[in-house]
Amino acid sequence: LSTVGTVTEIYDYLRLLYARIGHPHCHQCGLVVKPQDITQIVSSTVDLCVAHPEYTKKKGTRIMILSPIAKNKKGEFKELFSNLHKKGILECRVDGQILKTNTTQTLFKNNRHNIEAVLDKLVIGSVQSKPEYEKQRLTESIERALDISSGEVIVSIVTDPSFSFPDNPKQLEDHLFSQNLS
């Protein structure tokens, strides 16, 4: 289409037509992408958490609320991390890894980076939590994310076991303090 479209000069018209009448869809889930207000985002998030395969009524679904700060941008971003820490944001997800904002981050200035501020980590739908408190906290976190990133929010379901925070942690044992583990 691009060669034919360019040669016949119809490409610009097709692009304009698709932009006006087209409906963008999510490439992962197939749902139509459209603007939503905060209550719709909260409702969709809760529905997504309950429908997630790792959801159980006892444990719920663990999520992180993220605010995109830099998308595919080059730089070291030292000042950005400092400013985020001053605003009370303690963690960022940088290129998929969670990093603290108060430590000196060394990013390659010639590489492109994706940086998202971690605004909240919470569990949706567990038996210990109260639904009205969950919704209020989720709403506040999403509002803050939308304010910081000018209308965008990322809700990430945490399935990585390294993010596990057990209710009943294991007891400390002497072999955990072995020099072989250091």
Predicted regions and their residues:
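Long, non-coiled-coil amphipathic alpha-helical linker/lever segments
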Residues: 115-118
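Cys/His-rich Zn2+-binding cysteine-cluster or related metal-binding knuckle/ribbon modules and their
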Residues: 1-110, 120-182
